[in-house]
């Protein structure tokens, strides 16, 4: 971690120092190496969703240099990584995605490529090129089953065009014999305004894709959470995932839009050195003790507030801060 980022990690306690440390309260099964890597290849998105802080991104460069994403991929070949070439952006703003997919898959049978897209830019040509390149997972975020319910949540996108693009991709996927090799998912965030459409949504998309998912809206960190309401629990997002910005900075979490928890840079240290480095170990130890209040980003995050972490309860003398999650 670079010195100028040190202040971004440790903050003041949210409600006093708490009891004296007697060892971790939990011991989460952190993977010895990442299993998922997200690459912010660009920072742009054509949508202006009211629930997403994407428009607040001011990172430079706006486009990840080829040398950066290739460096990350090359350093992790053969490790069974699922690469996600997007972060808080629409992946297909970046016209390099078929090339990126092909590069990741080249000479690495363990590598997988996954996209989550709003489908607004997914042309027939792009769909065919992605399938030919060997994309493994394609998830479509379509929050509604009518223009009236879709429009307010995905501001700036045309519902009919999005449905047409996603449907065409799925038709190419089906006709091309990709059902056995590429998983497809259509997902909707359920809100009161579209809850009445869930049945019709499932009926339409269910036969056309591998799976339909109806999920709930989550709250991004630092979007109104109060300091005194800090969640004193660990977090599942840091078990086996890494996240890289366009400049090669690695951050603790995919919800870190403003770079509050930068843990290293791939141009200064290798991917695995960052993953198993001192900063990450410190952060894992804090999270295992439920001390989100001492991590600036996490001190205003309520993710997993209702999750039961009891199965990860620490036992006396258990002081290992990294371990394989295989079989968990």
Report residues per predicted region.
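Residue-level recognition of short loop/turn positions
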Residues: 48, 246-249
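Conserved C-terminal portion of the radical SAM core fold
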Residues: 40, 79-86, 104-114, 132-142, ...
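Short, small/polar residue-rich loop motifs at catalytic or cofactor-binding pockets
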Residues: 236-238
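Short, flexible active-site-adjacent loop segments at beta-strand->alpha-helix junctions, enriched
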Residues: 43, 89, 119-121, 144-146, ...
